[in-house]
Amino acid sequence: MINKYYNLGKNILFPINRSITGKGIIKTLKIFKKIHPKLKIKYFKSGKKVFDWIIPSEWNVKNAYVLDQEGKKIIDFKKNNLHLMGYSIPVNKKVSKKELLDKLFSSQKVKNAIPYVTSYYKKNWGFCVSKNHKNEINKKYKKDERFKILIDSNFKKNGNMPIGEYVIQGESKQEILISTYVCHPSMANNELSGPLLSMMLIDYFKKYKLNKTLRFIFVPETIGSIAYIHQNEKKMKNIIAAFNLTCVGDQRSFSCMLSKSENAPSDHALISTFKKLKIKFKKFHFTKRGSDERQF
């Protein structure tokens, strides 16, 4: 089973340009549905208000690159989809070297890595490169050189935001929620590891007759879980424990973030399991970090 999902992630899912909306996340959920046909794909309309949030317009991108004066591509979205800042607006113009450098995002901590940057709720554009790459551009080109910017993206105001849901019905109405998010592009640990682990858990638990109902959801981070809660407030009352699976694919020690009270059934189940299996782990307070744990 592990090899099956490892190969799925590496060869099929990793190259897909995912975001909180758009063709990439829909394609990913449809791949999951082929494996588990009972998985339901549900859609939330762009512009819909969920609590005090608004579902954003659907974003898609065909191409994006930067050309130097000689017509050479120095940044190419098609070589690595992390090069384009997520939700970049359409751009087709020439800019100065200073303007270009101001629009290049890089990481000071890991100088050979391309950072993941988004601008979901503010109109903006930009490219992401390693710090080393940015330094090379700054060193190679003269102050007065100009660069061609192309971002072939579009926004659909009448678009959709998809989520995936898979329920394994138990004998009890009480539920355990397992959430993960599917909105990141080519990043293995954050976040293909969570969805792939959820798929493996579905494979495992669907073979058994369960006491509690298991509800798996695959959502865009933050806005997806908020929209899901907004639509399913009554169902959420049946949930007695919830887990959010994220960044479970690296070689560091296990870590967990407990509930606000640190006294929920999920807290006791998690801590006791770690101790029983003699697994070393780090514990984080609810206010210190988190992704969709904040919502649930």
Language model features by range: what are they?
Residues 1-295:
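N-terminal hydrophobic/helix-forming segments and targeting peptides
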